Amino acid sequence: YAAIIIQDYGNIMMESVAIGALDQGKLEETMDLYQRSFVILKKFLTVKPDREAPWCKRKFDSERFQWELNFFLKEYLENVAGIVLSESEALTFKKESVALSNFLASNSDHFVHRDFHSRNVMVKNEKLAVIDFQDARYGPVSYDLVSLCFDSYIPFEIKDRVTLVNRGIEHISNGNTGLKEDLENQWRAMLLQRQLKAIGSFGYLSVRKNRGNYLKYVKPALETLDPSIVFDERWPFISSKIIELIATSTK
């Protein structure tokens, strides 16, 4: 026998609570809300593998990350922005995509929600609950932290997003030096990859799927790709030139 326990958590998303507080100038109240969500992230790291669990049969490996970067190239840069890379640029993009993807996949053995952002966290009686976790899988330890702190739905200033990430790292690592180093070494590259994938998704949902104006989130996503944060000499074309091309398409 099996039982399914269902609880109605209402219709108040973390997004609306956070935006409401920011609109009233209550930045610290919003930051505290995110601090509480870090408790959930920390719990994610305690999820034990089970070979029968669906999430254990999926993983963010190098091939998947490369596929997502190519998805961005096709569904946004080419299909929305109308920008086609030259042959040499395409080769550089491919080479750097492999390097970036290999780096992220080298430490990709943690439970990740995959869509952990302010629209998938519900708020009821000051308590938080996670929804939409059917795409969970193995992935980089920084994936969900970056997803939450840099989602395009909340109008944080970039300095506040960085503050959130640093607070999240401290809470999640909780004195674990190795875990803290992994998070600090990885989150910028993770931000770059994930936001390019998100921009690709905005193009895909708006143009191919006609699901509404998701293109309005491209600029907020672009603003999170601050050069002082994401530029990396290991993949300079992707972390600089590609971002410049996105910027020209949004003017």
Where do the PLM segments sit?
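An alpha-helical support segment within catalytic cores of ATP-dependent transferases
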Residues: 49-58, 63-64, 68-111, 179-181
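Active-site acidic catalytic loop and adjacent metal/ATP-binding pocket
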Residues: 44-45, 98-145, 155-156
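Conserved NTP-binding catalytic cores of kinases and kinase-like/nucleotidyltransferase enzymes
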Residues: 1-2, 110, 124-129, 243-251
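Hydrophobic packing residues in well-ordered alpha-helices of helical domains and bundles
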Residues: 30, 34-37, 65, 90-93, ...
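ATP/Mg2+ or Mg2+-diphosphate-binding catalytic cores
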Residues: 200-251
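Secondary-structure capping and boundary motifs in well-ordered enzyme cores
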Residues: 33, 64, 108, 113, ...
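Active-site activation/catalytic loop segments of kinase-like enzymes and analogous catalytic loops
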Residues: 70-80, 141-177, 189-209, 221-228
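ATP-binding pocket architecture of kinase catalytic cores
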Residues: 1-61, 65-67, 71, 78-81
